[in-house]
Regions:
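Bacterial N-terminal signal peptides that target proteins for export
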Residues: 1-7
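A generic alpha-helix propensity feature with a strong bias for hydrophobic helices
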Residues: 7-8, 87
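Hydrophobic h-region of N-terminal signal peptides that target proteins for export
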Residues: 11-21
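Aromatic-lined ligand-binding clefts that engage carbohydrates, nucleic acids, or primary amines
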Residues: 21-76, 205-208, 218-219
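Domain-level detector of nuclease and nuclease-like folds
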Residues: 67-250
Length: 250
């Protein structure tokens, strides 16, 4: 007779082994963006405001979203890095200092994201990791920038009914996705160590968010789809999903 706890434990160990390898299949951000839209499907929702979208156009009425300023960008869907690419990108020397091959047609050297993406495979794999990517309203993608997550004192709601607040370079998301964000940070920090992704202060905050907002069916389903496409698991999602009987595994 099978022992369910032992099966779950074995799957958890396997997931931890696979997640440690990180993304090894998706080697370009452009491909990753297409896959993110594929995962979202016909009933796609944005992360920060839970707005419906189709054909890369946002349905503001579905979530009560009101553009703060950039109405053109507010209508379109972009792909958001939850852990900002700039934040882990700065750990790569090619981002900070450039590379001998990072020279434009005029012979001028360049650095930053473009150079890291051109020359460093590890950076490309991190940039394209599906667990860290979500469809998002373009305006929010721009406004969030590379700001850290935390608690914001201001009570002003600048985006209509969307509970997304920014103040003094700190972003506070709606309570329903705080655990999701925490588990993404845990995964990225564990999978790609020594990239400065998670400090002690942020870790304590995300541990609280993880407890307050446990996994739900939607998060588990998305993680399962990503594992099939990318080949590795986010154990910080998969483990509690398995324990709750919410993970769809082949």
């Amino acid at each position: 007779m099978r022992n369910p706890p032992l099966i779950v434990a074995a799957l958890v160990i396997l997931a931890a082994t696979l997640s440690a390898a990180g993304n090894q299949r998706i080697r370009s951000f452009n491909k990753a963006k297409r896959l993110v839209m594929q995962i979202a499907g016909d009933d796609g929702r944005t992360l920060y405001c839970n707005c419906r979208f189709s054909d890369k156009e946002v349905d503001h009425d579905s979530c009560g979203y009101v553009p703060r300023r950039d109405t053109r960008r507010a209508r379109r869907i972009e792909i958001e890095h939850v852990v900002p690419a700039e934040n882990f990108g700065r750990s790569f020397i090619e981002w900070r200092e450039g590379h001998a091959t990072c020279v434009n047609k005029e012979g001028k050297p360049f650095k930053g994201r473009r150079c890291a993406g051109k020359t460093n495979e590890t950076y490309r794999l991190m940039e394209a990791d599906l667990y860290n990517l979500f469809p998002e309203i373009g305006e929010l993608n721009g406004d969030r920038s590379n700001y850290r997550f935390g608690h914001v004192q201001s009570t002003d709601m600048e985006y209509g009914e969307c509970q997304f607040k920014i103040d003094e370079r700190v972003v506070e998301p709606r309570s329903e996705i705080r655990g999701d964000i925490a588990r993404i940070y845990f995964y990225m920090d564990a999978t790609y160590p020594e990239r400065g992704i998670l400090g002690n202060k942020s870790r304590k905050l995300f541990e609280a968010w993880d407890k307050a907002d446990p996994v739900d069916a939607a998060e588990c389903e998305r993680a399962s789809k990503i594992e099939k496409l990318q080949g590795n698991a986010n154990d910080f999602v998969k483990r509690p999903c398995l324990e709750a009987g919410l993970y769809i595994a082949d």
